[in-house]
């Protein structure tokens, strides 16, 4: 099977994968490795962004009092923990999205959704009178990064043979 020969196989970039057998060494050498690496290179920036958004509140919450926000210590701890709680919950739902929507499409959609909490936080921290519930909602939305991170990791692992999953992930 050759990736340049249209009749050779069905696993080509830009199309829906109908055949995917990464454990088959001939398939892996002819088509699989190139497609797996392409998907990995696309996923790395998306994973970085997801992880950064997911962990953002652990830095933001610590600095809010110095920026003039009058939240209690308890409220600050909730802001720091909310992304982890919502991310763990969203992981359940996000795991089902790759088979339903497709890996590339879901990577694009879920990564684009990270703009909502990122831009929201950018505006919210500029005004010390931002209500706590608004900040909590933004913190919960940062959990989108946790769900994205976990679903993307499981999606990428699908592309590699068992012997190479460790080095890919």
Model-derived features: positions:
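Extracytoplasmic
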Residues: 38-71
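Membrane-interface helix termini in secondary transporters
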Residues: 63, 95-96, 100
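Cytoplasmic loop-to-transmembrane helix junctions
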Residues: 75, 164-169
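Central cavity-lining transmembrane alpha-helices of secondary-active solute carriers
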Residues: 78-97
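Cytoplasmic membrane-interface "Motif A"-like loop-to-helix N-cap segments
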Residues: 99-111
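C-terminal ends and interior cores of transmembrane alpha-helices
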Residues: 112-128
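Hydrophobic core of transmembrane alpha-helices in multi-pass small-molecule transporters
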Residues: 117, 131-147
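Intracellular juxtamembrane helix-capping segments at the cytosolic ends
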Residues: 147-161
